[in-house]
Amino acid sequence: MARWTAADIPDQTGRTIVVTGANSGLGAVTATELARAGAHVVVACRDTAKGERAAARMPGSAEVRRLDLADLASVGEFAAGTGQIAVLVNNAGVMATQLRRTRDGFELQIGTNHLGHFALTGLLLDRISDRVVTVSSSAYRLGRIRLDDLNWEHRRYQRWLAYGQAKLANLLFTYELQRQLAAAGSTRTALAAHPGYAATNLQSHTESIQGRLMGTTNRLLAQSP
């Protein structure tokens, strides 16, 4: 079987696709290739200046809109300004950060990677015609959902276990969303995607010596997005 590449993306003309975190890394590449295939891409990101620079390099049609997944008010504002779309790509995320809280008080990784996307998907679901794609990671194997301490308030914070919890939540959310869509007879689908070891800014922003080492090994071992 031939290896699938971006050249195999079918024509996306007439479709609007929202990609979170599309100002850099995997999100930027995803948005670029979808725009190249004819989609109108919405670059949803916190830093709109970076988003504008990324969008300027994209072929075809792209617009930039502010979305801060660590602020549920921002998520609500973004959803309120969004019309009908074909696809939502839940890509944005943070990895192995120091213990911090979102504007709403959630631990940053579960709040940004899962809860922000959970809220966004729920608010947009009746306007999505085709699919929801959520980027997960093999790091879900590190995770355990601790509903009794989801926000790491009663135990010593461990950044990689917190990341694993968030990525496991992504997978479980996708599984349950797909189950409910199928049970309702919907033709829409919910999918999770593991990108493999890709050289992005995510690893170098882990705020640790290990993160800086990962940023270095990216150049040697990781695949290009």
What are these model-predicted stretches?
Residues 166, 192, 212-225:
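C-terminal helical subdomain
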Residues 2-206:
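Rossmann-fold NAD(P)H-dependent dehydrogenase/reductase core
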Residues 209:
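Short acidic-hydrophobic sequence patches enriched in Asp/Glu that either
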